[in-house]
Protein backbone atom coordinates (compact mmCIF):
# COMPACT_ATOMS: atom_id res chain seq x y z
CA UNK A 1 0.00 0.00 0.00
CA UNK A 2 1.34 3.42 -0.93
CA UNK A 3 2.69 5.66 1.80
CA UNK A 4 0.83 8.97 1.82
CA UNK A 5 3.13 10.87 4.14
CA UNK A 6 2.96 14.64 3.95
CA UNK A 7 5.41 16.47 1.75
CA UNK A 8 5.59 20.28 1.77
CA UNK A 9 4.68 21.56 -1.69
CA UNK A 10 5.31 25.30 -1.97
CA UNK A 11 2.79 27.47 -3.66
CA UNK A 12 3.76 30.76 -5.25
CA UNK A 13 5.67 31.92 -2.19
CA UNK A 14 4.93 29.73 0.85
CA UNK A 15 5.02 25.96 1.42
CA UNK A 16 1.68 24.23 1.86
CA UNK A 17 1.55 20.64 3.20
CA UNK A 18 0.08 18.31 0.60
CA UNK A 19 -0.07 14.51 0.48
CA UNK A 20 1.62 12.55 -2.26
CA UNK A 21 1.83 8.83 -2.82
CA UNK A 22 5.26 7.31 -2.36
CA UNK A 23 5.44 4.19 -4.49
CA UNK A 24 7.17 1.36 -2.61
CA UNK A 25 9.89 -0.67 -4.30
CA UNK A 26 8.48 -3.57 -6.29
CA UNK A 27 10.75 -6.02 -4.46
CA UNK A 28 9.67 -4.74 -1.04
CA UNK A 29 13.19 -3.86 0.09
CA UNK A 30 13.88 -0.68 2.06
CA UNK A 31 16.47 1.80 0.77
CA UNK A 32 18.88 2.75 3.56
CA UNK A 33 20.39 5.70 1.69
CA UNK A 34 19.61 8.96 3.47
CA UNK A 35 18.76 7.32 6.79
CA UNK A 36 20.55 8.14 10.06
CA UNK A 37 22.08 5.42 12.19
CA UNK A 38 19.22 5.46 14.71
CA UNK A 39 16.61 4.84 11.99
CA UNK A 40 18.68 2.03 10.48
CA UNK A 41 18.83 0.43 13.93
CA UNK A 42 15.04 0.69 14.25
CA UNK A 43 14.53 -0.93 10.85
CA UNK A 44 16.86 -3.80 11.71
CA UNK A 45 14.95 -4.39 14.95
CA UNK A 46 11.61 -4.28 13.10
CA UNK A 47 13.00 -6.85 10.65
CA UNK A 48 13.71 -9.29 13.48
CA UNK A 49 17.13 -8.62 14.97
CA UNK A 50 17.38 -8.44 18.74
CA UNK A 51 18.35 -5.11 20.31
CA UNK A 52 22.04 -5.96 20.67
CA UNK A 53 22.38 -7.22 17.10
CA UNK A 54 20.37 -4.30 15.68
CA UNK A 55 22.68 -1.80 17.39
CA UNK A 56 25.85 -3.59 16.26
CA UNK A 57 24.76 -4.16 12.65
CA UNK A 58 23.41 -0.63 12.21
CA UNK A 59 26.76 0.79 13.34
CA UNK A 60 28.63 -1.45 10.90
CA UNK A 61 26.30 -0.78 7.96
CA UNK A 62 26.27 2.97 8.60
CA UNK A 63 30.08 3.00 8.43
CA UNK A 64 30.13 1.06 5.16
CA UNK A 65 27.40 3.24 3.63
CA UNK A 66 28.66 6.71 4.40
CA UNK A 67 32.34 6.37 5.28
CA UNK A 68 33.36 3.83 2.65
CA UNK A 69 30.67 4.27 -0.01
CA UNK A 70 29.84 0.58 -0.30
CA UNK A 71 26.50 -0.40 -1.86
CA UNK A 72 26.87 -4.22 -1.82
CA UNK A 73 26.28 -5.96 1.50
CA UNK A 74 28.60 -8.78 0.39
CA UNK A 75 31.49 -6.28 0.42
CA UNK A 76 30.88 -5.41 4.09
CA UNK A 77 33.61 -7.73 5.32
CA UNK A 78 33.26 -7.24 9.08
CA UNK A 79 29.65 -8.45 8.96
CA UNK A 80 29.13 -12.19 9.34
CA UNK A 81 28.78 -13.98 6.00
CA UNK A 82 25.46 -15.46 7.09
CA UNK A 83 24.12 -11.99 7.90
CA UNK A 84 24.93 -10.43 4.52
CA UNK A 85 22.27 -12.31 2.49
CA UNK A 86 19.73 -11.54 5.23
CA UNK A 87 20.44 -7.84 4.80
CA UNK A 88 20.39 -8.02 1.00
CA UNK A 89 16.96 -9.69 1.03
CA UNK A 90 15.43 -6.88 3.06
CA UNK A 91 17.41 -3.74 2.29
CA UNK A 92 19.19 -1.91 -0.49
CA UNK A 93 21.72 0.94 -0.68
CA UNK A 94 20.52 3.14 -3.51
CA UNK A 95 21.94 5.88 -5.67
CA UNK A 96 20.19 8.29 -8.05
CA UNK A 97 20.04 6.77 -11.52
CA UNK A 98 22.47 8.34 -14.00
CA UNK A 99 20.74 9.21 -17.28
CA UNK A 100 23.58 11.22 -18.79
CA UNK A 101 27.01 12.56 -17.77
CA UNK A 102 28.58 15.55 -19.54
CA UNK A 103 32.05 17.06 -19.35
CA UNK A 104 32.76 20.71 -20.14
CA UNK A 105 35.91 21.94 -21.82
CA UNK A 106 36.75 23.79 -18.58
CA UNK A 107 36.56 20.61 -16.48
CA UNK A 108 33.05 21.15 -15.12
CA UNK A 109 30.95 18.00 -15.03
CA UNK A 110 27.17 17.72 -15.08
CA UNK A 111 25.02 14.69 -14.40
CA UNK A 112 21.40 14.28 -15.41
CA UNK A 113 19.95 12.07 -12.69
CA UNK A 114 16.63 10.33 -12.23
CA UNK A 115 14.63 9.33 -9.18
CA UNK A 116 13.19 5.82 -8.86
CA UNK A 117 9.76 7.20 -9.79
CA UNK A 118 11.09 8.66 -13.04
CA UNK A 119 11.72 12.36 -12.33
CA UNK A 120 14.84 14.05 -13.70
CA UNK A 121 17.14 16.51 -11.93
CA UNK A 122 20.74 17.67 -12.26
CA UNK A 123 23.93 18.09 -10.25
CA UNK A 124 27.21 19.78 -11.20
CA UNK A 125 30.84 19.36 -10.09
CA UNK A 126 33.15 22.36 -10.52
CA UNK A 127 36.91 21.73 -10.12
CA UNK A 128 39.22 24.61 -9.23
CA UNK A 129 42.93 24.83 -8.43
CA UNK A 130 42.42 24.53 -4.67
CA UNK A 131 38.95 23.02 -4.29
CA UNK A 132 36.26 20.93 -5.90
CA UNK A 133 32.66 22.10 -5.44
CA UNK A 134 29.53 20.00 -5.89
CA UNK A 135 26.34 21.92 -6.73
CA UNK A 136 23.45 19.89 -5.28
CA UNK A 137 19.74 20.04 -6.14
CA UNK A 138 17.00 20.01 -3.49
CA UNK A 139 13.86 19.80 -5.64
CA UNK A 140 12.72 18.58 -9.03
CA UNK A 141 11.77 21.92 -10.53
CA UNK A 142 11.03 25.10 -8.59
CA UNK A 143 8.12 27.41 -7.77
CA UNK A 144 9.94 30.71 -7.32
CA UNK A 145 9.84 31.75 -10.98
CA UNK A 146 13.01 33.86 -10.85
CA UNK A 147 12.96 35.45 -14.29
CA UNK A 148 16.66 35.04 -15.08
CA UNK A 149 16.85 31.37 -14.01
CA UNK A 150 16.18 28.47 -16.38
CA UNK A 151 15.02 26.20 -13.54
CA UNK A 152 12.43 28.86 -12.70
CA UNK A 153 10.65 28.14 -15.98
CA UNK A 154 9.89 24.60 -14.78
CA UNK A 155 6.97 23.61 -12.61
CA UNK A 156 7.73 22.01 -9.27
CA UNK A 157 7.36 18.24 -9.55
CA UNK A 158 8.31 17.29 -6.00
CA UNK A 159 10.84 17.66 -3.21
CA UNK A 160 13.88 15.42 -3.23
CA UNK A 161 14.15 13.05 -0.28
CA UNK A 162 17.14 13.00 2.10
CA UNK A 163 18.37 9.91 0.27
CA UNK A 164 18.13 11.61 -3.11
CA UNK A 165 19.97 14.68 -1.79
CA UNK A 166 22.82 12.91 0.01
CA UNK A 167 22.82 10.39 -2.84
CA UNK A 168 24.14 13.13 -5.13
CA UNK A 169 27.17 13.53 -2.88
CA UNK A 170 27.68 9.77 -2.77
CA UNK A 171 27.39 9.49 -6.53
CA UNK A 172 29.90 12.28 -7.09
CA UNK A 173 32.36 10.62 -4.73
CA UNK A 174 31.81 7.36 -6.63
CA UNK A 175 32.70 9.04 -9.92
CA UNK A 176 35.68 10.91 -8.48
CA UNK A 177 37.16 7.82 -6.85
CA UNK A 178 36.86 9.27 -3.35
CA UNK A 179 36.29 5.96 -1.56
CA UNK A 180 39.08 3.69 -0.24
CA UNK A 181 38.85 1.27 -3.18
CA UNK A 182 38.94 3.99 -5.86
CA UNK A 183 36.58 4.48 -8.77
CA UNK A 184 33.28 2.65 -8.95
CA UNK A 185 32.55 0.57 -12.04
CA UNK A 186 30.61 2.42 -14.71
CA UNK A 187 31.04 5.89 -13.25
CA UNK A 188 34.63 6.79 -14.14
CA UNK A 189 33.43 8.67 -17.21
CA UNK A 190 36.09 11.39 -16.99
CA UNK A 191 39.58 11.09 -15.56
CA UNK A 192 40.64 13.72 -13.02
CA UNK A 193 44.34 14.36 -12.52
CA UNK A 194 44.84 16.49 -9.41
CA UNK A 195 43.77 16.55 -5.80
CA UNK A 196 42.51 19.81 -4.36
CA UNK A 197 43.02 19.53 -0.62
CA UNK A 198 45.61 18.49 1.90
CA UNK A 199 43.89 15.18 2.62
CA UNK A 200 43.62 14.34 -1.07
CA UNK A 201 39.92 14.95 -1.53
CA UNK A 202 38.63 16.07 -4.89
CA UNK A 203 35.18 16.98 -3.54
CA UNK A 204 35.93 19.56 -0.84
CA UNK A 205 32.87 21.83 -0.85
CA UNK A 206 29.11 21.55 -1.30
CA UNK A 207 26.74 24.30 -2.38
CA UNK A 208 22.98 23.88 -2.19
CA UNK A 209 22.57 25.92 -5.35
CA UNK A 210 21.18 23.37 -7.79
CA UNK A 211 17.56 22.98 -8.80
CA UNK A 212 14.97 24.15 -6.28
CA UNK A 213 14.71 26.33 -3.17
CA UNK A 214 16.36 24.45 -0.26
CA UNK A 215 14.35 26.23 2.42
CA UNK A 216 11.10 25.05 0.80
CA UNK A 217 12.37 21.50 1.45
CA UNK A 218 13.87 22.29 4.82
CA UNK A 219 13.44 19.02 6.73
CA UNK A 220 14.84 16.85 3.95
CA UNK A 221 17.76 19.21 3.26
CA UNK A 222 18.57 19.41 6.98
CA UNK A 223 18.49 15.64 7.41
CA UNK A 224 20.68 15.08 4.34
CA UNK A 225 23.26 17.68 5.37
CA UNK A 226 23.47 16.23 8.87
CA UNK A 227 24.58 12.96 7.29
CA UNK A 228 27.11 14.81 5.15
CA UNK A 229 28.53 16.59 8.21
CA UNK A 230 28.52 13.56 10.53
CA UNK A 231 32.07 12.74 11.64
CA UNK A 232 31.25 9.02 11.42
CA UNK A 233 29.89 9.44 7.92
CA UNK A 234 30.97 11.72 5.08
CA UNK A 235 32.60 14.06 7.62
CA UNK A 236 32.50 17.28 5.61
CA UNK A 237 32.83 20.40 7.78
CA UNK A 238 29.84 22.74 7.95
CA UNK A 239 32.26 25.52 7.02
CA UNK A 240 32.62 23.86 3.61
CA UNK A 241 28.87 23.78 2.95
CA UNK A 242 26.85 26.74 1.68
CA UNK A 243 23.08 26.87 1.41
CA UNK A 244 21.59 29.40 -0.99
CA UNK A 245 18.10 30.84 -0.58
CA UNK A 246 16.10 33.31 -2.62
CA UNK A 247 14.80 34.74 0.64
CA UNK A 248 12.45 32.41 2.50
CA UNK A 249 12.71 34.63 5.57
CA UNK A 250 10.71 32.54 8.09
CA UNK A 251 13.06 29.57 7.61
CA UNK A 252 16.40 31.38 7.77
CA UNK A 253 16.80 31.37 11.55
CA UNK A 254 16.01 27.65 11.69
CA UNK A 255 18.56 27.08 8.97
CA UNK A 256 21.26 28.70 11.08
CA UNK A 257 20.23 26.94 14.28
CA UNK A 258 19.46 23.44 12.97
CA UNK A 259 21.95 23.13 10.11
CA UNK A 260 24.56 25.81 10.82
CA UNK A 261 26.11 25.97 7.37
CA UNK A 262 27.23 29.08 5.48
CA UNK A 263 24.43 31.20 4.04
CA UNK A 264 24.17 32.64 0.54
CA UNK A 265 21.31 34.91 -0.49
CA UNK A 266 20.10 35.40 -4.05
CA UNK A 267 19.66 39.16 -3.84
CA UNK A 268 20.09 40.27 -7.48
CA UNK A 269 18.48 43.70 -7.05
CA UNK A 270 18.45 46.59 -4.59
CA UNK A 271 15.10 48.20 -5.40
CA UNK A 272 11.64 46.82 -4.77
CA UNK A 273 10.39 47.22 -8.35
CA UNK A 274 13.30 45.37 -9.93
CA UNK A 275 13.50 42.59 -7.33
CA UNK A 276 9.71 42.12 -7.50
CA UNK A 277 10.17 41.50 -11.22
CA UNK A 278 13.19 39.20 -11.28
CA UNK A 279 12.83 37.47 -7.85
CA UNK A 280 9.05 37.36 -7.25
CA UNK A 281 9.33 36.09 -3.67
CA UNK A 282 10.30 39.70 -2.90
CA UNK A 283 6.59 40.55 -3.06
CA UNK A 284 6.15 38.42 0.07
CA UNK A 285 9.44 39.05 1.87
CA UNK A 286 10.89 42.42 0.88
CA UNK A 287 14.52 43.50 0.79
CA UNK A 288 14.50 45.11 4.24
CA UNK A 289 12.91 42.07 5.88
CA UNK A 290 15.38 39.80 4.11
CA UNK A 291 18.42 41.83 5.15
CA UNK A 292 17.22 41.93 8.76
CA UNK A 293 16.95 38.13 8.70
CA UNK A 294 20.52 38.03 7.39
CA UNK A 295 21.67 40.30 10.22
CA UNK A 296 20.02 37.90 12.69
CA UNK A 297 21.41 34.74 11.05
CA UNK A 298 23.00 32.54 13.76
CA UNK A 299 26.76 32.24 13.40
CA UNK A 300 27.27 35.06 10.91
CA UNK A 301 30.51 36.94 11.59
CA UNK A 302 33.46 38.49 9.83
CA UNK A 303 34.99 35.01 9.80
CA UNK A 304 31.78 33.52 8.35
CA UNK A 305 30.41 36.16 6.04
CA UNK A 306 27.07 35.93 4.28
CA UNK A 307 27.42 35.75 0.52
CA UNK A 308 25.07 37.89 -1.56
CA UNK A 309 24.63 36.66 -5.12
CA UNK A 310 24.00 39.32 -7.73
CA UNK A 311 23.40 38.35 -11.36
CA UNK A 312 24.45 41.10 -13.78
CA UNK A 313 21.62 41.93 -16.18
CA UNK A 314 22.22 44.50 -18.90
CA UNK A 315 20.31 47.76 -18.34
CA UNK A 316 18.30 46.18 -15.53
CA UNK A 317 20.27 46.09 -12.26
CA UNK A 318 23.81 47.07 -13.25
CA UNK A 319 24.14 50.86 -12.95
CA UNK A 320 26.54 52.79 -10.73
CA UNK A 321 23.53 53.86 -8.66
CA UNK A 322 22.59 50.23 -8.06
CA UNK A 323 26.14 49.48 -6.92
CA UNK A 324 26.15 52.37 -4.47
CA UNK A 325 22.74 51.37 -3.11
CA UNK A 326 24.00 47.83 -2.59
CA UNK A 327 26.87 49.14 -0.47
CA UNK A 328 24.51 51.38 1.48
CA UNK A 329 22.08 48.57 2.26
CA UNK A 330 24.72 46.11 3.43
CA UNK A 331 26.31 48.75 5.65
CA UNK A 332 22.94 49.89 7.00
CA UNK A 333 22.34 46.40 8.39
CA UNK A 334 25.98 46.03 9.48
CA UNK A 335 26.22 42.76 7.62
CA UNK A 336 29.42 40.67 7.51
CA UNK A 337 29.07 40.29 3.76
CA UNK A 338 30.72 39.57 0.48
CA UNK A 339 29.09 39.93 -2.92
CA UNK A 340 29.46 37.47 -5.78
CA UNK A 341 28.82 39.22 -9.09
CA UNK A 342 27.55 36.66 -11.58
CA UNK A 343 27.62 37.38 -15.32
CA UNK A 344 24.22 36.31 -16.64
CA UNK A 345 24.43 32.91 -18.32
CA UNK A 346 22.13 32.86 -21.35
CA UNK A 347 19.59 30.16 -22.11
CA UNK A 348 17.00 29.79 -24.92
CA UNK A 349 14.10 32.18 -24.46
CA UNK A 350 15.70 34.26 -21.71
CA UNK A 351 14.33 37.80 -21.42
CA UNK A 352 17.67 39.33 -20.39
CA UNK A 353 21.19 39.87 -21.64
CA UNK A 354 24.45 39.86 -19.72
CA UNK A 355 25.99 43.18 -18.72
CA UNK A 356 29.16 44.05 -20.61
CA UNK A 357 32.50 43.11 -19.03
CA UNK A 358 33.29 46.83 -18.67
CA UNK A 359 30.02 47.48 -16.82
CA UNK A 360 30.57 44.50 -14.52
CA UNK A 361 34.09 45.70 -13.66
CA UNK A 362 32.82 49.22 -12.95
CA UNK A 363 30.07 47.82 -10.68
CA UNK A 364 32.60 45.64 -8.87
CA UNK A 365 34.98 48.55 -8.35
CA UNK A 366 32.27 50.68 -6.71
CA UNK A 367 31.38 47.89 -4.27
CA UNK A 368 35.06 47.24 -3.50
CA UNK A 369 35.63 50.95 -2.89
CA UNK A 370 32.72 50.82 -0.46
CA UNK A 371 34.67 48.32 1.62
CA UNK A 372 32.88 45.14 0.54
CA UNK A 373 34.50 42.29 -1.37
CA UNK A 374 32.82 41.90 -4.78
CA UNK A 375 34.64 39.41 -7.00
CA UNK A 376 33.25 38.52 -10.42
CA UNK A 377 32.44 34.84 -10.69
CA UNK A 378 34.00 33.14 -13.69
CA UNK A 379 31.27 31.32 -15.63
CA UNK A 380 31.85 27.56 -15.59
CA UNK A 381 30.25 24.87 -17.70
CA UNK A 382 28.41 27.16 -20.09
CA UNK A 383 28.99 24.80 -23.02
CA UNK A 384 27.00 22.04 -21.27
CA UNK A 385 24.36 24.35 -19.71
CA UNK A 386 25.84 23.77 -16.25
CA UNK A 387 26.51 27.39 -15.30
CA UNK A 388 24.60 29.36 -12.68
CA UNK A 389 20.95 29.78 -13.70
CA UNK A 390 21.16 27.31 -16.59
CA UNK A 391 20.00 24.09 -14.93
CA UNK A 392 16.86 22.60 -16.40
CA UNK A 393 16.37 18.89 -16.78
CA UNK A 394 16.92 17.31 -20.15
CA UNK A 395 13.39 15.98 -19.89
CA UNK A 396 12.37 19.57 -20.51
CA UNK A 397 14.98 20.16 -23.24
CA UNK A 398 14.68 16.85 -25.05
CA UNK A 399 11.73 14.50 -24.86
CA UNK A 400 12.15 11.10 -23.29
CA UNK A 401 11.02 9.57 -26.57
CA UNK A 402 13.92 11.26 -28.33
CA UNK A 403 16.35 9.88 -25.76
CA UNK A 404 14.81 6.41 -26.07
CA UNK A 405 15.18 6.54 -29.87
CA UNK A 406 18.81 7.59 -29.52
CA UNK A 407 19.49 4.76 -27.06
CA UNK A 408 17.79 2.22 -29.34
CA UNK A 409 19.83 3.43 -32.32
CA UNK A 410 23.05 3.12 -30.33
CA UNK A 411 22.11 -0.40 -29.21
CA UNK A 412 21.26 -1.41 -32.78
CA UNK A 413 24.57 -0.03 -34.04
CA UNK A 414 26.47 -1.88 -31.32
CA UNK A 415 24.65 -5.12 -32.15
CA UNK A 416 25.44 -4.81 -35.85
CA UNK A 417 29.14 -4.46 -35.05
CA UNK A 418 29.17 -7.50 -32.78
UniProtKB/Swiss-Prot annotation:
Reactions this protein catalyses: adenosine(2503) in 23S rRNA + 2 reduced [2Fe-2S]-[ferredoxin] + 2 S-adenosyl-L-methionine = 2-methyladenosine(2503) in 23S rRNA + 5'-deoxyadenosine + L-methionine + 2 oxidized [2Fe-2S]-[ferredoxin] + S-adenosyl-L-homocysteine; adenosine(37) in tRNA + 2 reduced [2Fe-2S]-[ferredoxin] + 2 S-adenosyl-L-methionine = 2-methyladenosine(37) in tRNA + 5'-deoxyadenosine + L-methionine + 2 oxidized [2Fe-2S]-[ferredoxin] + S-adenosyl-L-homocysteine
Domain Radical SAM core: 128-383
Amino acids binding [4Fe-4S] cluster: 142, 146, 149
TM stretches of this protein: none
PROSITE patterns noted in UniProt: RADICAL_SAM
Primary localisation category: cytoplasm
GO molecular function, one term: rRNA binding
Enzyme class: transferase
SS bonds (residue pairs): 135-388
Any Gene Ontology CC annotation: cytoplasm
Bias type Basic and acidic residues, positions: 399-408
Residue numbers annotated as active site: 122, 388
GO biological process: rRNA base methylation; tRNA methylation
Xref: InterPro entries: Aldolase_TIM, Methyltransferase_A, RlmN_N, RNA_MTrfase_RlmN, rRNA_lsu_MTrfase_RlmN/Cfr, rSAM
EC number: 2.1.1.192
SUPFAM superfamilies named in the record: Radical SAM enzymes
Compartments where located: Cytoplasm
Note, other: Reaction proceeds by a ping-pong mechanism involving intermediate methylation of a conserved cysteine residue.
Physiological role: Specifically methylates position 2 of adenine 2503 in 23S rRNA and position 2 of adenine 37 in tRNAs. m2A2503 modification seems to play a crucial role in the proofreading step occurring at the peptidyl transferase center and thus would serve to optimize ribosomal fidelity.
Protein name: Dual-specificity RNA methyltransferase RlmN
Gene name, Swiss-Prot/TrEMBL: rlmN
Amino acid sequence: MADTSLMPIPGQVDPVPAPRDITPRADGRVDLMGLPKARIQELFAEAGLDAKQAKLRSKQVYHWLYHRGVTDFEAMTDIAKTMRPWLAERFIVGRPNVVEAQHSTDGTRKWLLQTDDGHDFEMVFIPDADRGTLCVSSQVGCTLNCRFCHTGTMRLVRNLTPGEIVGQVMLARDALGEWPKGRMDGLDDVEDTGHYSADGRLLTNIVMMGMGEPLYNFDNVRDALKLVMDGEGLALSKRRITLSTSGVVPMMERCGEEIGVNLAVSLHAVTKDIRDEIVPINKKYGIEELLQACADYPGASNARRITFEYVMLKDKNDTDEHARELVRLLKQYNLPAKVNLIPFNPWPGAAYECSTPERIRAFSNIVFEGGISAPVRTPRGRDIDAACGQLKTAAQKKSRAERDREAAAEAEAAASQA
